[in-house]
A protein has these predicted regions:
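Canonical Rossmann dinucleotide-binding motif of NAD(H)/NADP(H)-dependent dehydrogenases/reductases
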Residues: 1-31
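Short-chain dehydrogenase/reductase
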Residues: 71, 121, 167, 205-208
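C-terminal helical subdomain
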Residues: 175-176, 182-188, 194-231
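Catalytic loop of short-chain dehydrogenase/reductase
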Residues: 90-110, 115-118, 122, 129-176
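A glycine-rich helix->loop->beta "capping" turn
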Residues: 50-53, 73-86, 92-94, 179
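The beta1-alpha1 cofactor-binding region of Rossmann-like NAD(H)/NADP(H)-dependent oxidoreductases
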Residues: 37-38, 58-72
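Conserved glycine-rich Rossmann-like NAD(P)H-binding loop of the short-chain dehydrogenase/reductase
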Residues: 26-42
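Rossmann-fold scaffold of SDR-type NAD(P)-dependent oxidoreductases
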Residues: 9, 81-89, 113, 138, ...
Length: 231
């Protein structure tokens, strides 16, 4: 059987790098993307040095030109994708409530956490359509839950709630072709989560990798620890 092929955004560090590692350990071919070329190549070389099938491609998810170029390059080689992991994300709220958050912060957060994943998903659909088991995994957050969202990070929460609605819309419109789910990794010790977070990156990546690889996953759900949670 052909190797399964995944692409992961924001994979030069944190949960993204770990998702690439876990997928590649399962003998997948993984395209590791990052907006910083040097950091992305370094992460890729570290994994490839362990014998893993990992390739680098530069991608700033907020740059439409980058997205177009990536889609063109992947169309030429490898010509198909099985899984897109929309992992790249920013948290820039700086302790401001929704009464004081600047529109600039809101816009920049939406660009990275919502418009980027949206445009990238659309651009890579032709390649996902060539898979017999295509999936999009949107790395969201409990802070984006409408049912439990008040956590003091308004721009971030709004962007992840929008990402979740993107999951719902795409899951419906692509039914039978691509499974689309949101996932909360939990509170993870990364640059974003900070050193006091309760989870390792290995644990944070677990449900993301499960949604990418398990034969029996749902469609159009919000998942944490392999279980459905409320929107
Ligand atoms: N850590 C947690 O507790 C936690 C909890 C819930 C959800 N999440 C979500 O999990 C995902 C991964 O977060 P993390 O904890 O691994 O955070 P992280 O260590 O801060 O990593 C974020 C990654 O996203 C990349 N990124 C940001 N903007 C980008 C852009 N425009 N284009 C491409 N890449 C971009 C960063 O690249 P640079 O290095 O260039 O900045 C970095 O590689 C995010 O979507 C986050 O919202 C994390």
């Amino acid at each position: 059987m052909d190797k399964r092929i995944a692409i992961v955004t924001g994979a030069n560090r944190g949960i993204g790098t770990e998702v690439v590692r876990q997928l590649a350990e399962k003998k997948w071919k993984v395209i590791l993307t990052a907006r910083d070329e040097a950091q992305g190549r370094k992460a890729c070389e570290d994994l490839a040095g362990r014998g893993l099938d990992v390739q680098f491609h530069r991608l700033d998810v907020t740059d439409p030109e980058n997205i177009h170029r990536l889609a063109q390059d992947l169309k030429a080689d490898p010509g198909r994708l099985d899984v897109l992991v929309n992992n790249a994300g920013v948290l820039m709220d700086e302790d401001r409530g929704s009464d004081r958050i600047t529109i600039e912060t809101l816009r920049r957060t939406m660009e990275a956490n919502f418009f980027g994943p949206f445009q990238l998903s659309q651009a890579l659909l032709p390649l996902l359509n060539r898979s017999d088991d295509a999936r999009i995994v949107n790395v969201s957050s409990g802070l984006g839950q409408l049912s439990d969202g008040g956590g003091g990070y308004p721009a971030y929460s709004i962007s992840k709630a929008a990402l979740n609605m993107m999951t719902v819309q795409l899951a419906e419109d692509l039914k039978g072709r691509v499974k689309v789910n949101s996932v909360c990794p939990g509170w993870v010790r990364t640059e974003m989560g900070g050193p006091g977070a309760t989870r390792s990156v290995e644990k944070g990546a677990e449900s993301i990798v499960w949604l990418a690889t398990d034969p029996m996953i749902p469609n159009g759900k919000f998942i944490r620890d392999r279980k459905e949670i409320a929107w």
